[in-house]
Amino acid sequence: MSASGGTKAIVAALSANLAIAVAKFVAFLFSGSSSMLAESVHSLADSGNQGLLLLGGKKAKREATPQHPFGYGRERYIYAFLVSIVLFSVGGMFAVYEGYEKIKHPHEIEAWYWPVGVLIFAIIAEGFSFRTAIKESNQTRGALSWTEFIRRAKAPELPVVLLEDFGALIGLVLALAGVGLAIGTGDGVWDGIGTLCIGILLIAIAIVLAAETKSLLLGEAAGTDQVEKIKAAVVDGDTVTGIIHMRTLHLGPEELLVAAKIAVQHDDTATEVANAINAAESRIREAVPIARVIYLEPDIYNEAAARSGTNPAKNAAKDAKGPAEEAPDAKGPSDPTETSH
């Protein structure tokens, strides 16, 4: 997922949310609607969240240092996680509290045309922002469903903006329904119920965001397609005959670490093995350009021994030397290759 695409969606969402937040707050001042107050805080929180995403993207571009040798790519994950915290606390909990207070102490909505007009304007503005996020996401989504895209995306910006914009549109519909029922019935309780529903919605979205960004912070492997490309690139059929085991890890959305133990011929010289490793690294980077950090460890692998036990190197040494001697332990191919969830 390109960083530029994510930035475009973030800027579009930030511009829309700032304008909407001001309009909603003005509508609250004239009407006294708690739904409008909750929605204005919601839009303000969303604006702050987009600012956090932009800040995280900027910090992630810093060069690696001796203290952080793998760079700062995970800054984008950290700031995306902060977004979920802000959405939960500032947006969700405030709306729940405001809704509860309005249900407990209801009052009629004054100057009803202000909240109705602003909500219609906000739905249109959020619709344009949501459309931009969908358009940018479709460039990288491929054949994935939207649920799979959000779960598997390694760059957090677009999934965050998608969920925020989707939540904003649903929240606006809930606010419009609450205000409409309050105006139609003359009972301000409906305004409070709409506000309460908005808070519950924001909390639910915040929990989903927190779960997904937590997985990225813990460290996710490359996607299945990328793993298969790496496997195909490593083996040349001459010096490198196979992969004993391999691990991949995203150091950031666009930085991948690859570590593998590879099988080489037992009679190859050190120079031949070194040249084969360098060639394999070049093939990996060509197949998967985001593979920035690559560690390949050569080892001797015996296929016949692999079929006879779980430790092929050790079993092969036993067959050659007899029961009196044992070769040093070496890992076999029993470790599965990791893929993303």
Model-derived features with residue positions:
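Aspartate-rich (DDxxD/NDxxD/DxxxD) Mg2+/diphosphate-binding motifs
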Residues: 56-75, 105
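Alpha-helical transmembrane segments and adjacent TM-loop junctions that form the membrane-embedded core
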Residues: 75-319, 329, 335-341
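Acidic (Asp/Glu-rich) catalytic motifs at the cytosolic membrane interface
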Residues: 16, 31-59, 100, 159-173
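Residues that define the loop-to-transmembrane-helix transition and helix capping
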Residues: 7, 33-36, 188-192
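Hydrophobic alpha-helical membrane-embedded segments
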Residues: 18-26, 31, 43, 47-53, ...
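Short hydrophobic "helix-edge" motifs at membrane interfaces and signal-peptide entry regions
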Residues: 7, 21-23, 32, 116, ...
